[in-house]
């Protein structure tokens, strides 16, 4: 029900924006017959909620009975009583990507190890090819 109400509200906003821009659009929206649509989905608590939330706004949700807190930035908890640590806030940022870029020193060490390994392999192959078998050797 709430989703249908939000979709109708969104459609009405789009139609109003077209009407404001001079483009005329004629459409009919279905009427909502449910009486609960007059009550906003979320509303502030009022005087009975003063002091309930320590660092935020006290709200009533239409679908859920009771008071709830909408915490200010940097606070969390049922009554917004806990401070969010700085490191925790950094890790919760959306769309953060961590990429590992090896330092130039590490890259030089790896390239050096590869070059030394190639040199040792070529020396080993060269000496193995040039060795004479024991049977062909002449002892004086």
UniProtKB/Swiss-Prot annotation:
Stretch forming the signal peptide: 1-18
Membrane-spanning ranges: 101-121
Biological process, per Gene Ontology: epidermal growth factor receptor signaling pathway; positive regulation of cell population proliferation; positive regulation of mitotic nuclear division
Domain of life: Viruses
GO CC terms in record: extracellular space; host cell membrane; membrane
UniProt function note: Stimulates cellular proliferation (hyperplasia)and mobility around infected cells to promote rapid and efficient spread of infection. This effect is beneficial for virus replication in vivo, because poxviruses replicate possibly better in proliferating cells than in quiescent cells. Acts by binding host EGFR, inducing its dimerization, autophosphorylation and leading to activation of several cellular pathways regulating cell proliferation or cell survival.
Family: Belongs to the orthopoxvirus OPG019 family.
Name of this protein: Pro-vaccinia growth factor
Organism: Vaccinia virus (strain Tian Tan)
